[in-house]
């Protein structure tokens, strides 16, 4: 699972590049934000 799921975002399906970090770690997949798995 990923932290971003707690606020309603999907988890990244594939390992993708981390593009932003706040309280969660974010990637972009299919032109949408996704949370990187912990």
What kind of region is each of these model predictions?
Residues 1-38:
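Extracellular/cell-surface secretome signature
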């Amino acid at each position: 699972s990923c932290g971003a799921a707690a606020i309603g975002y999907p988890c990244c399906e594939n390992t993708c590049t981390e593009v932003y970090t706040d309280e969660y770690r974010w990637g972009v997949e299919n032109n949408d934000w996704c949370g990187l798995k912990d």
